[in-house]
């Protein structure tokens, strides 16, 4: 099947990407694991260790070049109809080259002034080098992401702004960082990164340390292509 156009990708309205699934409010049921208690304790210990590592200065991630991206559900407001919808990582990356970059937070200075604008500016060059989809991911909720997009006057910019509000993708990649000790009230966020996936397999991974912005720019991604 032919790769969708950049314009189609920007609204996720192509045949290869599910036309969008509206959020449906429903009750949830509790489920209980049958794993032995010791296994659960070990898992909890591992999670605690990873959280501790994530708050340290050294970058620790469970994703690496050559790995298949974990699937996760992200949300966004479809500019075509204004509806709140979801898309999975698999839908974004299957059978195409996709650039995903993450910012610690919408409306924060570096993210608003450099990181996101850089990818918007270089979107055409990235597409010319074979990139089919470009998406910005943040742990902010979809309402904040929409407001951020509107505040920057992005309109139909060829970069998707996706919410990972439950940190599903962020934690699956092992790139969460705990900023609870900072005065800004940011809590747990995603490290700044940019990756290129080809049919869901990571080919390039530029992961920053702390709040740095050195290797995850659009310019650095262009150099890697």
From Swiss-Prot:
Keyword Cell membrane found: no
Class in the EC hierarchy, top level: oxidoreductase
Transit peptide: 1-42
PROSITE patterns per the UniProt record, alphabetical: THIOREDOXIN_2
UniProt keyword annotation of Transit peptide present: yes
One MF term in the entry's GO annotations: thioredoxin peroxidase activity
PANTHER family: PEROXIREDOXIN, PEROXIREDOXIN-5, MITOCHONDRIAL
Classification via InterPro entries: PRX5-like, Redoxin, Thioredoxin-like_sf, Thioredoxin_domain
Subunit relationships: Monomer.
CDD domains reported for this sequence: PRX5_like (cd03013)
Sequence similarity: Belongs to the peroxiredoxin family. Prx5 subfamily.
Catalytic activity, EC: 1.11.1.25
Function recorded in the entry: Thiol-specific peroxidase that catalyzes the reduction of hydrogen peroxide and organic hydroperoxides to water and alcohols, respectively. Plays a role in cell protection against oxidative stress by detoxifying peroxides. May be involved in chloroplast redox homeostasis.
Domain Thioredoxin per the UniProt entry, residue ranges: 63-225
Domain of life of the native organism: Eukaryota
Source organism (scientific name): Oryza sativa subsp. japonica (Rice)
Keywords: Antioxidant, Chloroplast, Oxidoreductase, Peroxidase, Plastid, Redox-active center, Transit peptide
Residues of the active site: 111 (cysteine sulfenic acid (-soh) intermediate)
Major subcellular site: plastid
Protein name as it appears in the record: Peroxiredoxin-2E-2, chloroplastic
Extra remark: The active site is a conserved redox-active cysteine residue, the peroxidatic cysteine (C(P)), which makes the nucleophilic attack on the peroxide substrate. The peroxide oxidizes the C(P)-SH to cysteine sulfenic acid (C(P)-SOH), which then reacts with another cysteine residue, the resolving cysteine (C(R)), to form a disulfide bridge. The disulfide is subsequently reduced by an appropriate electron donor to complete the catalytic cycle. In this 1-Cys peroxiredoxin, no C(R) is present and C(P) instead forms a disulfide with a cysteine from another protein or with a small thiol molecule.
Catalytic activity: [glutaredoxin]-dithiol + a hydroperoxide = [glutaredoxin]-disulfide + an alcohol + H2O
């Amino acid at each position: 099947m032919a790769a969708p156009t950049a314009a189609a990708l920007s609204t996720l309205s192509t045949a290869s990407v599910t036309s969008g699934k509206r959020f449906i409010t429903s009750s949830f049921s509790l489920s209980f694991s049958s794993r032995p208690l010791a296994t659960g304790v070990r898992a909890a210990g591992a999670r605690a260790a990873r959280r501790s590592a994530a708050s340290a200065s050294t970058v620790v991630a469970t994703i690496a070049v050559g790995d298949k991206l974990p699937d996760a559900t992200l949300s966004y407001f479809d500019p075509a109809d204004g509806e709140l919808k979801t898309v999975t990582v698999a839908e974004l990356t299957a059978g195409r080259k996709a650039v995903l970059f993450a910012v610690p937070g919408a409306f924060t200075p570096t993210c608003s002034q450099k990181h996101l604008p850089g990818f918007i500016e270089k979107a055409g060059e990235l597409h010319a080098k074979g990139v089919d989809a470009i998406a910005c991911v943040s742990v902010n909720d979809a309402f904040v992401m929409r407001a951020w997009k509107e505040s920057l006057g992005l309109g139909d910019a060829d970069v998707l702004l996706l919410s990972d509000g439950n940190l599903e993708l962020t934690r699956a990649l092992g790139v969460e960082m705990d900023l609870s000790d900072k005065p800004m009230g940011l809590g747990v966020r995603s490290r700044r990164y940019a990756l290129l996936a080809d049919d869901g397999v990571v080919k390039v991974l530029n992961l920053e340390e702390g709040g740095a912005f050195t290797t995850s720019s659009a310019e650095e991604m262009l150099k890697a292509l």
